[in-house]
Amino acid sequence: MDFLFVQFHSTIKLNFKTHHGSFFYYVKEYRCMSKEKLEFVEPVDTNTDNEYSREPVPLGARKSCFSLTIVWTGFVFLVTSMMAGGGLAAGLTFNELLLAMILGNIFLCIIAGLVSVIAYKTGLTFALLTRYSFGQEGSRIASLFVPIVNLGWYTIQAALYGHFIAQVFNLSYTGEVIAMMLSAVIMGIFAVLGIKSLAVFGYIAIPSIVFLSLGTAARSVQTIGGWQELFNYVPLQPIDLLSGITIVIGTWILSTATCIADIMRYGKSKKDVITASTIGLLGGNTLMISCGAIAGVAMNDGDLINVLLSFGLVFPSLLLLTTNIFTTNGANLYSTSLNLANSFKLNRNMMLAVLIAISALATMTQPYKIDSLFVFLSTLGIIVPPLCGIILADFYLVHRGKYIDYHKATFKKWNLVPWITWAIALVCVKFIPFGLPSLNGIVSGALLYALITYIVKPNVVSESKG
């Protein structure tokens, strides 16, 4: 190991060069420069990957609450939430719909807040958090499930965007294929540039999304004859309130249970991450669902893009779809790359290049037309939630809300307890006759993991000496 000392005013910078790369350690300089007087602070990885995919985010790299709110809210803004609102409008009165939105999003906020606090306290990606419960090698397999789902939806949304461009500009089949492939590549650029680019794009995109969504909803209200008509609306095929709440929870349960950690690990305080996650869901998701519901009642179509097109507003519809999909898909692929960086020994940027290439090629199959692909991804959406329950139980119940520092932790290679828990939880989800499968998965995963760990006591992580 080579040592290089460089003095900077009141600090000394030590460059440790190893076969794993180059790492800088900052140490405080005292008047007496003996070894006993050097105090090590947090390490900063100086490799080309500046997104801390394999280590905690240092305090100096943490982001403001506003920046976190922008990135997370941009992630939450999605066309499918609008469509969910349109679906809710088909079965609930508007008063019931408002109640379902509030209760469903409050539950999502609780899950998001719990995961966000873990991410803030540790500074770790969701993939690295799994090491504390699954072990060093077990984590590599466990963290594969989330990116598979994310990459699938990333590809579908890139293909949908390319297809929309082809429809608007009347492109040929070849033109549509090129548009879909370019969509996958261009959206991926934001993931390559990292958390900063996602925040910058969010500053531009979010005001546009809010303005266009509210404007479209207001135009829809005018079409139906005013707000009174909206509140007097009676659905033709009523559903119960619990089903409505379940649908709202289903819009973002997967990402609030997993991907949010990859954003909130940049938080500076518990208050910041809870505030950011709450605004994104109670503000952003509620806006998308309610605007979709209003359009669903007035225009019989919860997709605001289609509503704008029906008004003959092609450019606004293109702008809304662009900002809507790009903010979500950029963060989607960003999270995917972080999870896969834990599973494979590849640089994050190299991993992103591979993912973008795979996605671009996959769009050629026009995945938005493949029903079996949606079934596959939906199935994985049921399989993944117990993983979140395991992480929550491991941190809050087993470790009493405090993990051993990642740099001082020594992990076992494997722990069978979470795998056994996961399998039993999936059986429970299969046979529980009520509620949302993903929600049931989180709850059963958490309870079972805590119980089995209490009995077995696997001792997955220990603090290294020296």
Regions found by a protein language model. Name each.
Residues 33-95, 239-247, 265-272, 456-466:
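Membrane-interface "cap" regions at the ends of multi-pass membrane proteins
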Residues 65-81, 217-223, 233-295, 309-330, ...:
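Hydrophobic, membrane-embedded alpha-helices of multi-pass small-molecule transporters
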Residues 178-183, 187-222, 277-281, 376-388, ...:
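Membrane-interface loop-to-helix entry segments
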Residues 71-75, 143-147, 158, 169-193, ...:
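Transmembrane alpha-helical segments of multi-pass small-molecule transport proteins
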Residues 139-171, 325-342:
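Hydrophobic transmembrane alpha-helices that form the core helical bundles
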Residues 87-116, 138-140, 281-282, 444:
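Extracellular loop-to-transmembrane helix junctions
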Residues 388-466:
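C-terminal membrane-solvent junction of multi-pass transporters and transport-like membrane proteins
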Residues 86-91, 116-117, 160-170, 183-205, ...:
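Membrane-water interface regions at transmembrane-helix termini and the short interhelical loops
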